[in-house]
UniProtKB/Swiss-Prot annotation:
Protein name: Large ribosomal subunit protein bL32c
Region named Disordered: 1-24
Family per similarity comment: Belongs to the bacterial ribosomal protein bL32 family.
Superkingdom of source: Eukaryota
GO molecular function, one term: structural constituent of ribosome
Lineage: Eukaryota, Rhodophyta, Bangiophyceae, Bangiales, Bangiaceae
Any single biological process term in GO: translation
Length: 59
């Protein structure tokens, strides 16, 4: 079984964690932007029944 030989430094650990958090932040911003676009009706890349969407928003 593979075992690390030395302890990972704090700097490397923090850099990896910061990278992971930045990726998550970017994905969250994309999801929020997409949701806003769909709700305002300005998105052209989706094909859906507008009555179903309106009913879902009202409920």
């Amino acid at each position: 079984m593979a075992v690390p030989k030395k302890r990972t430094s704090k700097a490397k650990k923090n850099a990896r964690k910061a990278n992971w958090k930045n990726q998550a932040k970017t994905e969250a911003q994309k999801a929020l932007s997409l949701a806003k676009s769909v709700l305002t009706g300005k998105s052209n890349g989706f094909v859906y029944n507008t009555l179903e969407v309106a009913d879902a928003i009202v409920e």
